[in-house]
């Protein structure tokens, strides 16, 4: 046993230090980035924000809407092959370039993923998603899918430390998903005592990935546009959002009427709700590591997206970054004990 004495930080522990800027307006600023991926040497250009591969967020409808903002959607793995075929047949190939096909690590998942990818050459991205990216089985599956899909960009996770980021990149991942326990409907840290404050995880994992020519996704922990900006400032190449995009028209979640007010059900993918729906219940050997909440129905997602992107643009102008790529180079975080004035309630 040993204890690491270094203090690890989350988004709530810091603020950006403002700096001189030559920008006259937020409208001068571009959030579009272009990436070249390590293993395929292919390129992608767009706004590097991804809707999470949760079945109450990463829907086909969400993918269609977010593609209009040049953003990405990691479509959840629970759609059938028939549903995928209908989506591909009715969707422009350009839009499919903003879609990730999500998969688990079972043999059935592997077979299904290859069948989906065969539907269109425009489906370029694979999201290999497990709660614990530290298992040897996960690494072996990653090598297997890299060998089977040499021309596809692979996103894999989740992990929170540099040495495992390096392991995944060397095993075939182009992008590594970073985050254990920070999500709004995740209870892993409570049930297991395992986790890592998200900002420190991003900073350390970005350093490891960039040294090998890979990228990272900051997955989880963002509660407001300022947190999204902090993730980018800490070195994340992409940011994945679940709760911030939940309870919208495009989510496809269950709408519940409470005293005449519509709410939408939102739950973690390791919650009892998810396991009841997709696995026939919580297995005897495990505990639920997610919760189920009712969120006020928020209508179309486009207004929320504009608010998020507008906040990140504003951050860039405050620190003098003329494009999103420059944000991490212009970032100085200050440690704080307060974030905002809540005398009249939270924003």
UniProtKB/Swiss-Prot annotation:
The active site is at residue 186. InterPro entries: Aldolase_TIM, GMP_reductase, GMPR, IMP_DH/GMP_Rdtase_CS, IMP_DH_GMPRt. GO terms for molecular function: GMP reductase activity; metal ion binding. GO terms for biological process: purine nucleotide metabolic process. It catalyses: IMP + NH4(+) + NADP(+) = GMP + NADPH + 2 H(+). Keywords: Metal-binding, NADP, Oxidoreductase, Potassium. K(+) binds at residues 181, 183. CDD domains: IMPDH. PROSITE patterns: IMP_DH_GMP_RED. Its EC number is 1.7.1.7. It comes from the Bacteria. NCBIfam families: GMP_reduct_1, PRK05096.1. Catalyzes the irreversible NADPH-dependent deamination of GMP to IMP. It functions in the conversion of nucleobase, nucleoside and nucleotide derivatives of G to A nucleotides, and in maintaining the intracellular balance of A and G nucleotides. HAMAP family: GMP_reduct_type1. This is GMP reductase. The gene is guaC.
